């Protein structure tokens, strides 16, 4: 199986996701979105979709660098701001992140990365409260399945248009949308520290894991069939473990059911009944 087998009709995907954003924003009673613009492909695609769906005047991009962030990331974020003629703000998170770790021993890169992600979430939700807009998420399907993200950090949002697209499909959609090649072709990175790379952290490429996840989820192939395709068993076992172990990250907090109608389980909110005018 080749990664090209995951390709979609990206014109149709664009139409579906644009309609999704317009409809969900209206259902929630809002008109505009705010998102963190990192300079990476995921946030660039979400920003492009939001502008096409809602108009440039209804999209605010927030750049949130840390002192170790690469200059290239900021340049690529600004490239999207100029391309789309949207409003933007910049909030440096270095001071609050560094202050959090003052006097705390046993610091690790993982913990600092989580605090950075949650500091950015705080900024976005404060802007959301200030301006009366919704926060758009930028986590793709591959990241969500693997749990490669921070709960109540970069995984926090009100709407996420790309959460059902594998990373390889996000790249395909980016090409369709005309996202600058510099953003599509560079190595994926959360830019948490100098030289950090998603694929180095994970130990495999997005193309490799997207094919495996597609076989597991979309094709519903069993272990024996997947291994017969030439997938190494240790790779299969590790990815499966990541998907299973991180299920809790993909759910709202689990509620113990006591009554006949429990929020988030079997009680439908009024907004779900509203007609879209």
UniProtKB/Swiss-Prot annotation:
InterPro entries: NAD/GMP_synthase, NAD_synthase, NH(3)-dep_NAD(+)_synth, Rossmann-like_a/b/a_fold. It catalyses: deamido-NAD(+) + NH4(+) + ATP = AMP + diphosphate + NAD(+) + H(+). GO terms for biological process: NAD biosynthetic process. The keyword GTP-binding does not apply. Mg(2+) binds at residues 42, 143. It is an enzyme of class 6 (ligase). Its EC number is 6.3.1.5. GO terms for cellular component: cytoplasm. The keyword ATP-binding applies. Keywords: ATP-binding, Ligase, Magnesium, Metal-binding, NAD, Nucleotide-binding. GO terms for molecular function: ATP binding; glutaminase activity; metal ion binding; NAD+ synthase (glutamine-hydrolyzing) activity; NAD+ synthase activity. Pathway: Cofactor biosynthesis; NAD(+) biosynthesis; NAD(+) from deamido-NAD(+) (ammonia route): step 1/1. Deamido-NAD(+) binds at residue 118. NCBIfam families: nadE, PRK13980.1. Catalyzes the ATP-dependent amidation of deamido-NAD to form NAD. Uses ammonia as a nitrogen source. Belongs to the NAD synthetase family. This is NH(3)-dependent NAD(+) synthetase. It comes from Chlorobium phaeovibrioides (strain DSM 265 / 1930) (Prosthecochloris vibrioformis (strain DSM 265)). The lineage of its organism: Bacteria, Pseudomonadati, Chlorobiota, Chlorobiia, Chlorobiales. The gene is nadE.
